[in-house]
Amino acid sequence: IGREAIVGAGLQGPFGGPWPYDALSPFDMPYGPALPAMSCGAGSFGPSSGFAPAAAYGGGLAVTSSSPISPTGLSVTSENTIEGVVAVTGQLPFLGAVVTDGIFPTVGAGDVWYGCGDGAVGIVAETPFASTSVNPAYGYGGAIGGGVPYNSYGPIGYGGCGYNALY
């Protein structure tokens, strides 16, 4: 879920800066003080992707799944009027068919690119995440509580998610 679905389009973290979330992998590199190799990608000062791919800034995408017996599939629905050049990026796992429905003007094109390999099946056309920047971690202090440290780790709080010493 992009930050737009949580706080609205174009808004950043609770205190103005992008949230320090590393969308690459939770185990990719050490930059958290508690468990350096398992810092959940949100260490004291870690790479920040801004929580969403660059193409997700148009708002949240509704995802629904339903079945009369049990959930057996995923349906992604977006009912928008789109004008101009459009690029949709990301990876959507699927087995079976992909359907694009709607009116395509006589000028332009509508395509679905997909592929599979190494056990992964999904839509594979992607763009890079937003530019990486360095931002402080979550945690109480500084802006909340008048600078009172959280878990005795200073005014910006404990590196990572702030859950005791686990991460």
From Swiss-Prot:
A GO term from the CC aspect: egg chorion
This protein's UniProt keywords: Repeat
Molecular-function annotations in GO: structural constituent of egg chorion
UniProt KW Repeat keyword: yes
GO BP terms, alphabetized: chorion-containing eggshell formation
Chain segments carrying region Central domain: 56-126
Region listing for Right arm, in residue ranges: 127-167
The protein's name: Chorion class CB protein PC404
